[in-house]
Amino acid sequence: MQNNCKLIIAFIFLFSTVSAQENLPNYMTKKEVLQMPSYLQHFSNQLKNNQAAVPPSSPVRTMAEWEELQGILIGWTSYPSILREIVRAAKAECRVYIVTNNQQSVINYLNSGNVDTVNVSFVNTPFNSVWSRDYGPWSAYTNDVDTLVTIDWIYNRPRPDDDNVPVAIAGILNTPLYETTMPPYSLVHTGGNFMCDGFGTGFSSNLILNENPSLTESQIDTIMKQFMGISRYIKMPTLPYDGIHHIDMHMKLLNEETILMGQYPQGVADGPQIEANLLYVVNNFNSIFGTPYKVIRIPMPADNGAYPNTTGDYFTYTNSSFINNTIIVPTYNISQDSTALRIYKDALPGYNV
C-alpha cells in the first residue's frame, strides 16, 4: 500500500450560511456567463498539469464523506468568521489546509478568536473564491484501499485559479493526479452536485447532463466509472428555485443506507420537486446492501419567514460536512436551528454535532 493514510479527503466544505454574498458568489456572474465558452475551449487546447488525461489503470473507489480522513481544504477569502469556526472544530479532528495568499493575516484572525494553528497548514497558491467544496479535488483509491489518488474535474465556473487548486493539492500530497480535462474524458462537474456511498453509487442532479451537452448520459456514466468507480449513477431533475442546482442544498447521505432529505411546507418553493425526486429514488433504487433507503426529513428553513419562491434566500441544513467524529451543520440563528441539530444528533449517535 502507499499513500492510504495521507489526505483521505482533499476537498471541502463551506456552507451558504449568510445571505449577503461577498467576493465571487457561488453562482456565475453575468460576466462569467459570457466567459464560460472560452474557458471551456481552453481545455481542448492544453492540460492543466501537462500530463495525459487518462483514467487510472486499476479499478477506482471514491470514498464516502463519512470515512476516516486526515485533512480538509478551505479557501480563505470570504466569510472569515464562519471559516474560523470551521477551523476551530475541524482541527481537533484532522489537519486543516487553508488556501490563502496572506498567511499572516489568516493567523492573526484565527488568533483573535482564540484559534491557534496547531494542525493547520497553509497553501500558498492562487485561487478565486471561497467555494472549495465545489472546485476542490476528490480523493479516491485504486484497488479499493490501495493507493490514494486525486481526481480533478473541469470546474463549472470560469475561475481558472480555483480550477488549478486540485493540481496544487495533489502536488503537496504527492498523490497521482487524474484529470477529466481532455477529450474523450472531458467532464464539467462540481463538488456540491455529487455525493457517493463509497461502494460505487453516486448521486447528482441533472445539472451534470446540462453542463456536458456534447456527452450522452452513457458517456458521462462511463467517465465517472473509469475515474471514480461510480457504477450506479443516480440523477434527479433540478429544482426550480435552487439557482445552482447542487444536490447538497437539499440532500445528504448519512451512511450507505440513509438519506437526509430537506422538506418544505407542502406545496412551497422546491418542495414538490424534492418530493418527486425522493419518490423516484426510493421507488427505483435500494441501498448497496439491498435494503430500502431509510429516509430522514429535515426542515428547509425560512429566511425571516420567507422561502425562495418569494423573497427568501436559499437556506438549508443539508449542506453539512462530516469530519471524522464531528459533523458541522450550518445554522442561521433562527428557531429551526435547534430542531435541525436535534435531527442530526438523533440520526448520528456518537458524533459531535
Predicted features, each with a name:
Residues M1-N23:
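Bacterial Sec-dependent N-terminal signal peptides
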Residues Q21-V353:
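The feature marks the mature, well-folded catalytic cores of soluble enzymes
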